[in-house]
Amino acid sequence: MYNSASGGHIWEIGGTEAGRLTASGWVDSKGPVRSVPATEPGNTNYTLQPSDAGKYIDSQGTGNTVTIPQNTMSKGDVVTIVRATSGDVTIAQGIGVTMYHSADGANTTTGNRILAQRGMATLIFVGPNYCYISGAGLS
């Protein structure tokens, strides 16, 4: 094991060494590994950005819309939307985007969704313009 201090503290382990490494936290390119960072658009409509992958959207405005635009997310990206206050929020599939609601079992139901107050929905992208949505308080 060695510490390559030239590019920050990068630890590499090889061979058959045994021991313990104590760290105060783990961070990767998207942020802290043991917590989910938030995007907080406030009381306004919001359009997903590539930087939202691995985050949750804290939607607070009554009657607001979170839009999924075409060619924004990548295969494997996950975004969760939380409706933390009263009222509904619309989750809108943008032009050229197909959003399947997993609840029907056949995965044939597409279209905009409504997330009720205190609801939570997760989107997983299987391509830049295709995603599946599932959650509580989702219709």
Predicted regions and their residues:
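C-terminal trimerization/auto-chaperone modules of long, extracellular attachment fibers and adhesins
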Residues: 10-22, 47, 67-69
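Terminal beta-strand-rich extracellular "head" domains
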Residues: 95-115
